[in-house]
Amino acid sequence: MLASANDIALQIAEQIGGSVDGFVQMMNNRAVELGCTNTVFTNPTGLPDENQHTTAHDMALITKAAIDNESFRAIAETTSYTIPATNVSGGERVLTNNFSMLNNTNASYYQYCLGGREGYTEASGSTLVCGAEKNGVSLIAVILQGASGTTAAEAVSLLNYGFDNFQLLSLGDNDFDIAYG
């Protein structure tokens, strides 16, 4: 999540799934478990494939599950990480999270952002998915087929609208009649 690294995504897939295809099957099974109804993965990188597809709703379900996972959330919120030197690398390496909404020197920085990912391919245009939390309310924004350079601003607008116009309500047992069948 810190740096775009499709080679690492493939290595992780092989390690966890036994093969890339095995991991992709795990991805598709998990998507179904999460309630996704129009998502088919064909690779762990997210790179275009004519048989791979999803919807904004399904991406929101996947993002919610990811952000609810404390380990994932800790990684997604990390802005940089230093990999110590090894006998192969010869020196330490710094990985920087390139998600603009987490970078406080970027115009797209959003203080309530929990993490996310943005990308671009010719097939899908600009895309972004992120989670944010403010005053105990958690929201997810998904932008698909966006115009280049606008997805973070669009996500901020959506999140601000949600935070400004919706609130959590607690309904007690006596606040409404319950019909039993």
Specify the residue positions occupied by each region the protein language model found:
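Active-site-adjacent loops and short helices of periplasmic peptidoglycan-processing enzymes
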Residues: 1-57, 61-70, 134
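Domain-terminus/edge residues, biased toward the C-terminal soluble/receptor-binding domains
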Residues: 36-37, 51-53, 57-58, 63-181
